[in-house]
Swiss-Prot record:
Uppermost EC category: translocase
Domain of life: Bacteria
Topology relative to the membrane: Multi-pass membrane protein
Protein localization: Cell inner membrane
Family: Belongs to the PNT beta subunit family.
Single GO MF descriptor: proton-translocating NAD(P)+ transhydrogenase activity
Function: The transhydrogenation between NADH and NADP is coupled to respiration and ATP hydrolysis and functions as a proton pump across the membrane.
Entry annotated with the keyword NADP: yes
Assembly mode: Complex of an alpha and a beta chain; in Rhodospirillum, the alpha chain seems to be made of two subunits.
Catalytic activity field: NAD(+) + NADPH + H(+)(in) = NADH + NADP(+) + H(+)(out)
Any Gene Ontology CC annotation: plasma membrane
The protein's name in its UniProt record: NAD(P) transhydrogenase subunit beta
InterPro entries recorded: DHS-like_NAD/FAD-binding_dom (IPR029035), NADH_DH_b (IPR012136), PNTB-like (IPR034300)
Organism of derivation: Rhodospirillum rubrum (strain ATCC 11170 / ATH 1.1.1 / DSM 467 / LMG 4362 / NCIMB 8255 / S1)
Amino acid sequence: MTHSLTMAAYIVAGVLFILALRGLSNPESARNGNRMGMVGMAIAILTTLLSPSVQAYAWIVLAIAIGGAIGTVIAKKVLMTALPQLVAAFHSLVGMAAVLVATGALLNPEAYGIGSAGAIHAGSLVEMSLGLAVGAITFSGSVIAFGKLQGLIAGKPVTFPMQHPLNAVLGILLVVLLVVFAATESHTAYFALMILAFALGFLLIIPIGGADMPVVISMLNSYSGWAAAGIGFTLGNPLLIIAGALVGSSGAILSYIMCKGMNRSIFNVILGGFGSEGGVAAAGGAAGDRSVKAGSAEDAAFIMKNASKVIIVPGYGMAVAQAQHALREMADVLKKEGVEVSYAIHPVAGRMPGHMNVLLAEANVPYDEVFELEEINSSFQTADVAFVIGANDVTNPAAKTDPSSPIYGMPILDVEKAGTVLFIKRSMASGYAGVENELFFRNNTMMLFGDAKKMTEQIVQAMN
């Protein structure tokens, strides 16, 4: 394939990637967006395989077969509720790919056309060192995020004295090693840089609590994009640079939007220490010296069947219990009774960007019934019932009333303004932010203690 034809194919693939991002921004066009991304990637892979510089086809076919087999198994086995940790795992692979490509270029620069051993082009040294640093941070940070999301590591922040000064010192040392390697091509500086970047990725993510996981996933997505762009520079592949820049910039923009939705700066999230695990009070009982009103599935069924407008607020509890299908079934029963049903989604509900949207889409919930915070918040005051299923911190009125609360200033869903709040929860445990939800003790709140899926199924049975 000629160079001109290769560049033309890369441009087509790049345009398809941009259109894919545009399509994925809306649930109704997400399938088409996915298809365009797949076609773009197919064009990119075929074009690269037809490049004159590609010779070891046997190794490439073997790698594709192994990767394809693993991907097929993952697609069939992994549940929709496990998508956040799957995304984190994929980010780690991109980071490690950047590390391996940079290392391969250092050890065999002739194969990459960037010079010879001891005489690598200055620009390539800078590209390699940046790709290595970002890739290593992405890898170790994503591994920690995966561990937290999978429950292998405690979701609460892990902090220790002088943590931030240590990170600052390591950051400065990282920059120094970058400069030293770029100036001297020292293998010692390179591998020291690699170890330091791995350590920094670990130290940056370990103090971040579960409440910030959606932002962390988005941030790591951005890192993986820049790592891919670094690989593109090392390999001299313009499409990889374009794709990496698209992922990196979109991830950064999404991180900013989500931080804005939490009324927090990205620097607060990176510094960590927010999102501790809360204690547990007895289900159906009192938290401290305050009591709550507990109800049954029959109570909830009676209240909702006699309502005219119900707003459903899904959260991480729905994801854990895999209650999305039972929830849609309940909504269908309500609609048959003439009840107006809609869904309210908080931008940081769940453990990754769009987590609730993905689960509701899997349950075939109509897109026109799903609304973001800004679109639906004013509707709670006219709703007869707000049905909250495992959405804790994002419904806590303390975010508006208690300046001492760690979530103070975070925009919340105004569920307390509904006529009745039905709140499904396993116990009186606080959310990932580690603060008690004042909503539990409101006069118009009825707690429904139990597994979200089982409770919803019992409500459906009671309605029938």
